[in-house]
């Protein structure tokens, strides 16, 4: 062992929380920062990815037990599709990454790198639902999204690309849709508290913090120790 090798955590959680957290992530072997020129991106190392797989497996089982089917939609979304969801676009516009060239050829229409998938999933749900017999329809996607955050990034808290799941459903009535929302909120709460041993508070986001274009945004929130 070299004389200058640091053992344990040297930063103070109480007095320098940000640096303490970064040191924990590095020394626990959870992530590396991406190459120079890719600020805000991380490499998720095997240990952290295994944690994600366990969370994914737990949630995926809960979803499938309650009628959800997995699907996958394109990473790229035509600009015209985003424009159909103007409320969502306005909320994410500063964070959208765009592809405008393929090789040396300029694309006829710019393609957004998926910031969220409502605008690409909803048109297909409308095709798949032909009558009330097709309802409820429940689709889930495991994917990554890109949001070009201008604020300070931090591994696993706020990065420009991150892993997630997004569920999209269609229902015959508003009451059915609300019951579905509460069922999924229960499952998120179960995942935090029973799998991760993290107590959470559940509720609804205030008006200024709702998901762009949403009627209501429900949430489970954990307090940082």
Range-by-range predicted roles:
Residues 2-225:
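TRNA-recognition modules of translation machinery and tRNA-sensing kinases, especially anticodon-binding
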């Amino acid at each position: 062992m070299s004389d200058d090798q640091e053992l344990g955590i040297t930063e103070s959680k109480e007095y320098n929380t940000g640096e303490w957290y970064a040191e924990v992530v590095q020394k626990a072997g959870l992530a590396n920062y991406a190459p120079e020129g890719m600020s805000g991106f991380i490499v998720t190392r095997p240990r952290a990815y295994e944690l994600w797989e366990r969370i994914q497996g737990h949630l995926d089982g809960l979803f499938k037990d309650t009628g959800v089917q997995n699907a996958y939609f394109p990473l790229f979304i035509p600009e015209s599709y985003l424009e159909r969801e103007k409320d969502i676009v306005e909320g994410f516009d500063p964070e959208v990454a765009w592809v405008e060239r393929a090789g040396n050829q300029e694309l006829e229409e710019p393609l957004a790198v998926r910031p969220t998938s409502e605008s690409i999933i909803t048109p297909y749900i409308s095709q798949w639902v032909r009558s009330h017999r097709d309802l409820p329809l429940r689709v889930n996607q495991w994917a990554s999204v890109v949001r070009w955050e201008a604020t300070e990034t931090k591994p696993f808290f706020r990065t420009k690309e991150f892993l997630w799941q997004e569920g999209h459903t269609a229902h015959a009535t508003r009451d059915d849709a609300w019951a579905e929302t509460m069922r999924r909120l229960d499952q998120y709460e179960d995942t935090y508290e029973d799998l991760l041993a993290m107590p959470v508070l559940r509720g609804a986001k205030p008006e200024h913090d709702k998901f762009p274009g949403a009627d209501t945004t429900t949430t489970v929130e954990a307090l940082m120790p």
